[in-house]
Amino acid sequence: MAYAIIETGGKQLRVEPGRFYDVERLPIEPEGTIDLEQVLLVQTDSQVHVGQPYVSGAVVSGTVMEHRRGPKVIVYKMRPKKKTRRKKGHRQELTRIMINEIRLNGESLGG
């Protein structure tokens, strides 16, 4: 099974064709396609291609499924004996993408 390690949103992610992943919000409408060219590593059935920093000629293509929000994270700050309390919540904006295929030098490795 071929897989790739990509960089998106300042994070590294191991992706495989046919699976979906939640990444940082991307400025692409749902049902739109995306080509991720910041590929750090590509693993085929017989070889490993490691980039320095990126693998040249490697592209991971996918489809934007939907935009969503992550789970709520509560931040609570309190100073004892002072009646000072601060409660904040945060939900991260995410984009769910379906990985269609991994291409290396124009040749499809999966999908």
UniProtKB/Swiss-Prot annotation:
InterPro entries given in the database record: bL21-like (IPR028909), bL21-like_sf (IPR036164), Ribosomal_bL21 (IPR001787), Ribosomal_bL21_CS (IPR018258)
UniProt record, GO biological process: translation
GO MF annotation list: rRNA binding; structural constituent of ribosome
Keyword Cell membrane: no
Keywords annotated in UniProt: Ribonucleoprotein, Ribosomal protein, RNA-binding, rRNA-binding
Job of this protein: This protein binds to 23S rRNA in the presence of protein L20.
Protein name stated in the entry: Large ribosomal subunit protein bL21
Organism: Thermosynechococcus vestitus (strain NIES-2133 / IAM M-273 / BP-1)
Organism taxonomic ancestry: Bacteria, Bacillati, Cyanobacteriota, Cyanophyceae, Acaryochloridales
